[in-house]
């Protein structure tokens, strides 16, 4: 009998500890976890109205005949246009609360200008000169 107790006391102790831990967890859940899971409704009555649409316009002009353009659309996805005729412009609209438009342009002339306007207001305008001039415009938040 004592020989079996010497070998079985560790598994018995583990069994008692697991039983006490299970009972403790069950008791704690009756106090703190008895309300169930909260479900967030899909349609909110107090949703704010959409923002007024923002109109973002990219413009590139210069002394050359064509331009290579890289810009971010309003979803911040990079777009590329090779060999666009000058002058070039693009108008985008969004109802997002903010946008971060930017554009990079390189032409075959000696002068190039980029401009970003938001709702008719010029936010950034830059001009570069030199062989195959390159310029960029960047608006941190529109």
From Swiss-Prot:
Compartment(s) where it occurs, according to its Swiss-Prot or TrEMBL record: Cell inner membrane
Chain ranges passing through the membrane: 7-26
One Gene Ontology term, aspect cellular component: plasma membrane
Swiss-Prot/TrEMBL keywords: Cell inner membrane, Cell membrane, Membrane, Transmembrane, Transmembrane helix, Virulence
Phenotype on disruption: Deletion mutant does not exhibit a low iron growth phenotype, but has attenuated virulence compared to the wild-type strain. Deletion of both mmpS4 and mmpS5 drastically decreases synthesis and secretion of siderophores, and greatly reduces virulence in mice.
Gene3D superfamilies the record matches: MmpS1-5, C-terminal soluble domain
The organism's place on the tree of life at top rank: Bacteria
Recorded topology in the membrane: Single-pass membrane protein
Induction: Repressed by MmpR5. Repressed by iron. Regulation is IdeR-independent.
Family: Belongs to the MmpS family.
Job of this protein: Part of an export system, which is required for biosynthesis and secretion of siderophores. Essential for virulence.
Subunit-structure text: Interacts with MmpL5.
Name under which the protein is recorded: Siderophore export accessory protein MmpS5
């Amino acid at each position: 009998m004592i020989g079996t107790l010497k070998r079985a006391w560790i598994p018995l102790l583990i069994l008692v500890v697991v039983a006490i831990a299970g009972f403790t967890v069950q008791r704690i859940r009756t106090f703190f976890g008895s309300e169930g899971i909260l479900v967030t409704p899909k349609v909110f009555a107090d949703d704010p109205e959409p923002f007024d649409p923002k109109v973002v316009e990219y413009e590139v002009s210069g002394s050359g005949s064509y331009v290579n353009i890289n810009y971010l659309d309003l979803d911040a996805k990079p777009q590329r246009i090779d060999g666009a005729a000058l002058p070039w412009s693009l108008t985008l609209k969004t109802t997002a609360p903010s946008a971060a438009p930017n554009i990079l342009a390189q032409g075959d002339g000696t002068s190039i200008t980029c401009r970003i306007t938001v709702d008719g207001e010029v936010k950034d305008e830059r001009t570069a000169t030199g062989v195959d001039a390159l310029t960029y415009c960047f608006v941190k938040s529109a």
